[in-house]
C-alpha cells in the first residue's frame, strides 16, 4: 500500500507542478503555496511495521496538503476563466439589447486587451467588468435604448 500511495503522490506532485505553473502564468495574484515534496520523506521503510505505519501516516498528510494546494490553485484558475466568461456574457447582453455604444465598445476593447495579458490583471479586470455591467445596465434602461447610442 505504501509503495502505491507514494507513487500516486509522486505523480500527483508532477500534475500539481504543472497546475501551479499554469496559474502563475495566468493569474496576477496566484496563491503562494508550495507543492509538498514527497521525496523528502525518503524511501518506503522495510521491515518494522511501526515505521511503515508512521510513514504511511506522513504520506497521507502529504496527500492532504496536496489536496489543499490543488484546491487553492484550481480556484484561482477558475476565477480567471470566470472573468473571460463574464466578458462573453456582457457582450451577449449588449447584442441582445442591440446596443452599439462607443464608450461600451471602448470598455470591451480594453477588457479584451487585459484578457490577453499574461498574467491577467484579475483585480483590474474585475473592476472593469463591473463598470461594463453597470454601464450596460444604465444604457439598456435609457429611452430608445435599442440601436446606436452616441
Regions found by a protein language model. Give the residues of each.
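Long amphipathic alpha-helical segments
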Residues: 124-128, 145-150
